[in-house]
Amino acid sequence: GTSKDREEWFEDLDVKVFNRGDKADTLFWVGCAGSMVDRNIEVSRAMVKVLDAAGVDFGLLGAEEVCTGDPARRVGGELTYQVCTKENIETFERYGIKKVVTTCPHCFNTLKNEYPDYGGDLEVVHHSELIEGLLHEGRLKPKGNLDSVTYHDPCYLGRHNEVYEAPRTVVESVSEPGALVEMEKNRSQSHCCGSGGGYAWMDDKPEKRINQDR
């Protein structure tokens, strides 16, 4: 569990928030983990810096951001999923939000592929895709200094949505030539991290957990 709320992570940052009257071209959808889990918060804060550096006009929902409902749907809680979906789509419509970027593969998949069934007419991009575009446009010029790095293909980004090249382009942009070392199981054959499909909440013995095998 966590005692954090959805706005605590950006209290010291100068960012637009839609419910404060701010307007922006793009919504940065942070997600539950991105706003309340320490390790993921670091990713969210880094993403804000990247967006600012590239001059992207973006805003946050803050306290008005509700879970996409992905975990609930995966474990059979369809009613909870639909309640979350309805509330989020109403929020998108209220602020005229049409473009969304997110760092979470699960949120990405749900917003992009499942929300349209409920009227969620959105352009949804993963942050790696957005950053790849910014690199090609010359709006980001990172310094490559990582001498050894690997990349894990998340199930919902890779197998479900076939986003393979953008993350690698981004990783290579901050690495020395040849620094990216592929895992034995990669791309469509990537080994699940053991957190999706509600599995993160299953009470398996450690030796039987997917992430331990991985």
Model-found features: residue ranges?
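Iron-sulfur-cluster electron-transfer modules
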Residues: 1-103, 108-115, 119, 137
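Short, structured patches in soluble enzyme cores that scaffold and shape functional sites
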Residues: 30, 104, 126-128, 153
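Surface-exposed, flexible loop/turn segments at secondary-structure boundaries
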Residues: 34, 108, 132, 157, ...
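Short, well-ordered coil/turn elements that cap or connect secondary structure elements
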Residues: 53, 119-121, 146, 175
